[in-house]
Each structure stands twice: as structure tokens, then as C-alpha cells.
Regions:
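Structural signature of outer-membrane beta-barrel domains
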Residues: 1, 15-17, 36-42, 98-100, ...
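Outer-membrane beta-barrel and related beta-rich outer-membrane complex signature
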Residues: 22-24, 37, 41-51, 116-120, ...
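Outer-membrane beta-barrel signature, preferentially recognizing the C-terminal barrel domain
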Residues: 58-103, 131-154, 204, 215, ...
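Membrane-embedded beta-strands that build the outer-membrane beta-barrel scaffold
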Residues: 6-14, 29-35, 89-97, 102-110, ...
Length: 400
């Protein structure tokens, strides 16, 4: 299938105009704007028609007279499939000042993708488990800033640094599914939503940790809020809890901890991502560093579902979890009692949600230029040492 995806862009180099051409301060100033569409057809060929394939799950005949492997329909045809289309507006500014010692770029964008290609589940009575359709719209809006500073530059000493930062906000504009009761802080709202897949195929996370809700950001963490550990003198134990259990908040106050008490417990989408670079040269010695970081994103740390709880007899746990577990003679408001059960939906709590922000020294290079003025063999001789992923600063307790 074919479609038409137009685009255009224009730019105005303001620094070439007569009123800026002779400026001693502004060296370059360019304003940019653009609009365009692009299509995504990231699906298998012939997705609009039924495809045939062999199946070893259904066999005819016997080992005596031979076994025939049939050719079956693999999917339901959908002749109404169309392109997933992304439309984007861009506005930007390029500039440099002070003899190009300070330069930068600012970009604003507004992107919307409609008619998302998705496999949705259908009743198995149809003979198939899913069908490919166009469903849902998603938008991304953001700003990106890039700056470079050439501070000092002479024969003996050079120093420059730069950085970039990007802010992006994603919104699920439409999911294409009927609205239903969705609970936030114990209150039901009519919202269109669906749950994500089980992380780790259900082996660690035994229920979905992410939810997609129309009007919200993508992939929000959805589960139970907690408030420490039940103590021996507590009289407000809920739904069979005993001292030493995690105190799960009964959002709707019905005395039962169930799915109606789930709410938003985290957001994996960062507030911003950023990078830094520094370059230093003193005579023949040079040092360069490259940092990258993410700020404001949450992570569901699945390690805390296993080694973070002293459950059962056949797995290791963190020493802090075991030695500081709640005990009648040594109560804790951080770690539950030994044997506390975290299986099922109630395992997805804010106790496993951690701040995933980090700053990483991604690359460090130290070099030295040896003098080669009298050499007939070399035009330049530089020896350097490079290290990657050298340090990471983060509060996240899982693997980096």
C-alpha cells in the first residue's frame, strides 16, 4: 500500500540581514521552522490479508501411514489497515556570540502519532488470539537545548565545555478502548485504559506493574501504596494482616485489600535527560570527559520482590533484609517479618519503586602529545588512555 507524506522546512539567517551583519556581539542567528508527516509500516508483509503457514500443532494420519502437517490461516485479514502516521512541528534557533565562543541550539517540537498499529486480543472462539488494527493516538511535546562554551584557547592552554538537556512529555491521547471503572486513590473514574504485559513473564512480577491510561503519560506504575510495617500494638490491622506485615493502605476504606485499592505509584518517564562534556589541554597534556544523566524517572526494582523479602526457605536475601527484619523483640518499620508473603497483586507496591535518576561518567580520555618535530617517521604521536562507564552516581539500589 502507498500513501502521501508531505513535509517542508524553512529557515531565516537573521545574522545576514543588514541590521545584524556588522554586529560585534552576534556572529550567527538562524531561525528555523518545519512541519512534516512520516508513516510507519513496521509490520510483516501482507498484513492486510490472511497469511498461510504450516502448523505442527495439528497433525493428520499416523506414524504407520504417514503424518501430514497442514497449512493453516495464521491471522485474520484486516483490509482496513492503514499507515501509522506521525505528524510533527519543529521550531528552532541556532546562535553564536562573542566570536563564536558561546554557541547553542534551541528546538521546540510537537509530535503526534495517530492510528497506532497494535495487536489486540480477541475471543479465542474466533480461532485466533489477536488481530492487527489501527487504534490509538499518542503525543510528544518537548524542548531541547544545546550549549557550548569555548572559554580559553591559546597555544599553551585550552578549556571548553558544553552540555545538552531535553524535556519531553508523552500523553496517551486516545487508546481506542471503551471506558471502564479505573481506581485512583480509592475513587472510581470512567477512563479508557489497559494493563501492560507481565515483566519477567510473570516469574518475578506476578501481575502487571504498568498501566496505560488515556490522558496520562505512558507506562505509569500502578499498584498499592504502603505505610511502613504493622506493629504489635496496632489495632487497625486490615484484611487478616498480622504484626510484621507490610501496612498496605486501604484506599477506599472497605476493610479489604484488593484491586480497588490500587493507584498510581510511580512514573518511569524522566523529567529530563542531559549530557555534559569537558575538554582541557595544558601544553601537551589533554583531558576530556563525557557525562550523561537522567533525572526524575522511577524504576520498579524486581530484585526487591525476591532478595528484598525473607520469604520461604530456598532463596538468599539481602543481609539487611534478614538481620533487620521485623521481630517482636526487635520491631522494624522498614523490613517485614521473616516469612511475609509477597506473591500476587499485592507484591506490586511502592516499596519496590525507586528513584532511577543517575549521572554517569561515560567516557574519560587522558592523552599526551609527544614532540615529533625532529622525527622523520611521525607527523604526530599521541598516547592516550580511555575508560568507559567509570563512575555512576545514583540512589537506585539495583544494577547499574
Amino acid at each position: 500500500r502507498y500513501s502521501f507524506f508531505p513535509s517542508f522546512a524553512l529557515a531565516w539567517n537573521v545574522s545576514n540581514e543588514s541590521f545584524l551583519k556588522d554586529s560585534d556581539f552576534i556572529n550567527n542567528l538562524k531561525i528555523r521552522a518545519g512541519w512534516g508527516q512520516i508513516g510507519n509500516h513496521g509490520i510483516r508483509p501482507y498484513g492486510t490479508i490472511s497469511n498461510y503457514g504450516i502448523s505442527s500443532d495439528v497433525q493428520y494420519g499416523t506414524p504407520t501411514n504417514g503424518i501430514s502437517i497442514p497449512v493453516l490461516l495464521n491471522n485474520i485479514a484486516n483490509p482496513d489497515l492503514t499507515w501509522e502516521t506521525t505528524e510533527q512541528y519543529n521550531f528552532g534557533l541556532d546562535f553564536s556570540v562573542l566570536d563564536d565562543r558561546i554557541s547553542g541550539t534551541i528546538d521546540f517540537y510537537d509530535k503526534k502519532t495517530k492510528d497506532l498499529l497494535q495487536n489486540i486480543p480477541i475471543p479465542t472462539s474466533s480461532g485466533y488470539s489477536n488481530i492487527l488494527i489501527n487504534k490509538g493516538d499518542i503525543s510528544n511535546k518537548g524542548v531541547e537545548l544545546l550549549m557550548n562554551f569555548d572559554v580559553v584557547s591559546n597555544d599553551d592552554f585550552e578549556f571548553s565545555f558544553g552540555g545538552n538537556i531535553a524535556f519531553n512529555r508523552t500523553k496517551l491521547e486516545s487508546l481506542g478502548v471503551p471506558a471502564d471503572d479505573f481506581y485512583i486513590n480509592g475513587t472510581a473514574e470512567q477512563r479508557s485504559f489497559f494493563f501492560g504485559n507481565n515483566i519477567s513473564r510473570g516469574q518475578i512480577f506476578q501481575s502487571p506493574a504498568n498501566v496505560f491510561v488515556e490522558g496520562e503519560e505512558s507506562s505509569l506504575f500502578y499498584g498499592f501504596e504502603t505505610d511502613g510495617i504493622y506493629q504489635s500494638d496496632d489495632t487497625d490491622l486490615v484484611d487478616g494482616a498480622v504484626p510484621g506485615d507490610v501496612r498496605i493502605i486501604d484506599q477506599n476504606g472497605d476493610g479489604i485489600i484488593d484491586d480497588l485499592d490500587r493507584t498510581f505509584i510511580g512514573n518511569p518517564n524522566p523529567d529530563f535527560v542531559y549530557g555534559l562534556n569537558l575538554n582541557l589541554r595544558f601544553k601537551r597534556l589533554s583531558i576530556s570527559m563525557l557525562f550523561n544523566g537522567v533525572h526524575g524517572n522511577d524504576i520498579a526494582n524486581g530484585n526487591l520482590l525476591t532478595i528484598g523479602n525473607a520469604t520461604g526457605q530456598f532463596q538468599n536475601v539481602l543481609s539487611d533484609t534478614y538481620y533487620n527484619a521485623w521481630r517482636p523483640d526487635a520491631p522494624s518499620n522498614v523490613h517485614p517479618r521473616i516469612g511475609y508473603n509477597t506473591v500476587g497483586d499485592t507484591a506490586i507496591t511502592d516499596r519496590i519503586i525507586e528513584d532511577g535518576s543517575f549521572l554517569r561518567l561515560n567516557n574519560l580520555t587522558i592523552g599526551f602529545d609527544f614532540p615529533v618535530e625532529k622525527s622523520k617517521l611521525f607527523d604526530r604521536l599521541n598516547v592516550f588512555v580511555m575508560a568507559q562507564n567509570l563512575f555512576t552516581w545514583t540512589n537506585y539500589s539495583g544494577y547499574n
